[in-house]
């Protein structure tokens, strides 16, 4: 899958550093890197409200950072191929944020 690295860097920067929900989205991405999960599993493991997790999953899926399989409640989420291939960009953004 061909992706413009600069555009992806800007998108990830906005999703993670440029919005109030960025830290939560970063945690979701890190969790999904480890293992695919559904919204309820994420909410439980992250100690977050289910609706909050659903909101962030929707944002990440609309921006093609994650993908899903299944319907509604039972849908499992995982990193998209684009995100898997470019995960290092995400790590770079996190490292820059943590150094500040």
Q: Language-model segments: what does each one mean?
A:
Residues 64:
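Glycine-centered, phosphate/nucleic-acid-interacting loop/turn motifs that mediate DNA/RNA or nucleotide
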Residues 51:
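Key DNA-contact positions within bacterial/archaeal DNA-binding proteins
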Residues 11, 75-100:
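Conserved segment of winged-helix/HTH DNA-binding domains
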Residues 1-26:
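Short alpha-helical segments that sit at the start of domains
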Residues 41-45:
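A short acidic, leucine-rich amphipathic alpha-helix
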Residues 26-32:
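Hydrophobic residues on short alpha-helical segments
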Residues 22, 70-76:
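Short, Lys/Arg-rich nucleic-acid/phosphate-binding segment
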Residues 23, 34-38:
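Short capping segments at the starts of secondary-structure elements
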């Amino acid at each position: 899958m061909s992706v413009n690295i600069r555009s992806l860097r800007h998108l990830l920067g906005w999703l993670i550093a440029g919005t109030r929900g960025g830290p939560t989205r970063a945690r979701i991405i890190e969790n999904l890197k480890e293992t695919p999960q559904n919204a309820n599993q994420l909410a439980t493991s992250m100690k977050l409200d289910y609706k909050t997790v659903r909101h962030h999953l929707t944002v990440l899926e609309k921006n093609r950072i994650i993908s899903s399989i299944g319907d509604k409640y039972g849908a499992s989420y995982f990193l998209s191929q684009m995100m898997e291939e470019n995960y290092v960009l995400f790590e770079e953004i996190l490292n820059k944020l943590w150094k500040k």
